[in-house]
């Protein structure tokens, strides 16, 4: 689990990032990011019901993404608000492929 300070929780913050953020994409992720005035990054994860009808699969994917983010958190000392949305292909990928794809995309932000 990410620390509370590293999570985006309010719908207002999500809407602002979606409206004013920049976008980077890969085959299985879409990252929308916006600079914040904090000394640490904040993350939000969105897995649409269109990707999988099963809530169990969607929540498992969110847990995997949080685990990857927890490992890469020390790399991002800059202040960014980052929303990670998944694409349909990401549901069936194994952990190592997810980690490689997400880390590759996050490194583009540096």
Q: Positions of the model-derived regions?
A:
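Positively charged, solvent-exposed patches that mediate nucleic-acid binding
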Residues: 1-110
């Amino acid at each position: 689990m990410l620390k509370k300070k590293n999570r985006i929780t309010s719908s207002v913050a999500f809407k602002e990032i979606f409206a004013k953020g920049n976008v980077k994409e890969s085959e299985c992720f879409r990252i929308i990011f916006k600079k914040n005035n904090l000394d640490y990054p904040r993350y939000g994860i969105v897995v649409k019901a269109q990707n999988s009808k099963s809530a169990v699969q969607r929540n498992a994917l969110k847990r995997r993404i949080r685990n990857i983010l927890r490992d890469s958190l020390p790399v991002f000392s800059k202040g960014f608000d980052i929303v990670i949305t998944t694409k349909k292909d990401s549901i069936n990928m194994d952990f190592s492929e997810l980690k490689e794809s997400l880390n590759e995309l996050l490194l583009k932000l540096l």
